[in-house]
Structures are given as C-alpha cells and as structure tokens.
C-alpha cells in the first residue's frame, strides 16, 4: 500500500513538472511574428530609402512612418482576427448550451495591443541604429549590424520559449531578414539608377 501511494505521489509530481510548450505557441507566434515583422519591414524600408537618398532625416522619417503604419496595421489585423475567433467560440458555446466563460475566451484588445507593441519593439532597433550615425556608409552598416544581432536574438528567443532548436531557428530568421533587406536595397538602387 505504501508503494502504490508513493507511485501516485511520483505521478502527481511528474504531471506538475511537465509543461505543455504547445500552449505557448499562439502568443509566442504572434509576439515573434510582430517583432520580426517590425524589425525586417522597417529596416528594409530604411535600406530602400537609404539606397537612393543619403540624407539621414529621410531615412529616419521613412523608418518612423513605417513603424507607425506597421504597428497600426498589425493591431487592426490582430483585432479583426481574434474577434472572429471570439465570435466563433461564443457561437459554438451557445449552440452547445454551455455557459460562456469570458475569462477563457481570447481578448481582441489585448491581442491588438500586444501585436502593435511587438511590432514597435522590433521597428525601434533599426531606427536607433541609424539615428546617431551621420555618415552614409557607416549608417547603412550600423543598421545591418543592429538588425543582424536583433534577428539572431529574436530567433533564439522564439526557439528557447518554444523549446525548439536555437541554431536552426536563428539561422532561418537571420537569412529571411538579410534577404528582405538585400532585395529592397538592390531593387530600389536599380530603380534609382535607371529611373524606372
């Protein structure tokens, strides 16, 4: 009897120490996507403007406009998406004649705020990197270096929180960010040179 009691205690301990990381996936995906999107889209926009205009003010203003527009867009998109999910879950509970537990339902406002905040957190990195560097080439280099470090951190953070392989995650995020910046810079430079 003592042995079965100790086995039960061990099972309870095992259950309490086991954590289902898949439950984190929804908010983790939204946070990483928002921050990564803010980082890459703002940096790419700044690189594109920097390809044709060497003026620091133009680069910073374009990055700031991109940050504000992107944060608003992400917030609205997340609000609409989560509100649709909310409506579906409420309708299903009503069909099943189940008492609606509001605290278990997703919050569209929280999701919108979190998405806008995550986007802004990512977007601020290239803005700060460019803001204090007057010389054109050094400004471009500082944006690329700051974005590279941030992409690696975001990739590692996403992997660590989701208990996934960190190197692969960081490499994937880094390659995607570099590709976006290179394509934007290259195409804008080409259009600027040939006046297309």
Curated annotation (Swiss-Prot):
GO cellular component: vacuolar membrane
One example of a Gene Ontology biological process annotation: intracellular manganese ion homeostasis
Family annotation (InterPro entries): Ccc1_fam (IPR008217)
Topology with respect to the bilayer: Multi-pass membrane protein
UniProt tissue specificity: Expressed in roots, leaves and inflorescences.
Xref: Pfam families: VIT1
Domain of life: Eukaryota
Entry's transmembrane regions: 32-52, 60-80, 113-133, 140-160, 173-193
Residue ranges, Vacuolar side: 53-59, 134-139, 194-196
Induction profile: Down-regulated under iron deficiency. Induced by iron supply.
Alphabetically ordered keywords of this record: Ion transport, Iron, Iron transport, Membrane, Transmembrane, Transmembrane helix, Transport, Vacuole
Membrane-side (Cytoplasmic) residue stretches: 1-31, 81-112, 161-172
Record-stated family: Belongs to the CCC1 family.
Misc note: Can mediate sequestration of iron ions into vacuoles when expressed in the yeast ccc1 mutant.
PANTHER family on file: FE(2+)/MN(2+) TRANSPORTER PCL1 (PTHR31851)
Protein name: Vacuolar iron transporter homolog 2
Taxonomic placement: Eukaryota, Viridiplantae, Streptophyta, Embryophyta, Tracheophyta
């Amino acid at each position: 009897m003592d042995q079965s009691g100790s086995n039960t205690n061990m099972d309870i301990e095992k259950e309490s120490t086991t954590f289902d990381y898949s439950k984190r996936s929804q908010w983790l995906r939204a946070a990483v996507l928002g921050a990564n999107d803010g980082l890459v889209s703002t940096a790419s926009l700044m690189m594109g403007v920097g390809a044709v205009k060497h003026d620091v003010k133009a680069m910073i203003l374009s990055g700031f406009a991109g940050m504000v527009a992107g944060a608003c867009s992400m917030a609205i998109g997340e609000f609409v998406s989560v509100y649709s999910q909310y409506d579906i879950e409420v309708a299903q509970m009503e069909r099943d004649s189940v008492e609606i537990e509001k605290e278990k339902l997703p919050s569209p406002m929280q999701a919108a705020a979190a998405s806008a905040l995550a986007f802004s957190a990512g977007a601020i990195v290239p803005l700060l990197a460019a803001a204090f560097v007057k010389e054109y080439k050094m400004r471009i280099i500082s944006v690329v270096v700051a974005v590279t470090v941030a992409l690696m951190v975001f990739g590692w953070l996403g992997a660590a929180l989701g208990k996934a392989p960190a190197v692969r995650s960081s490499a994937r995020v880094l390659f995607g960010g570099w590709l976006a910046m290179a394509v934007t810079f290259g195409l804008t430079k080409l259009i600027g040179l040939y006046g297309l």
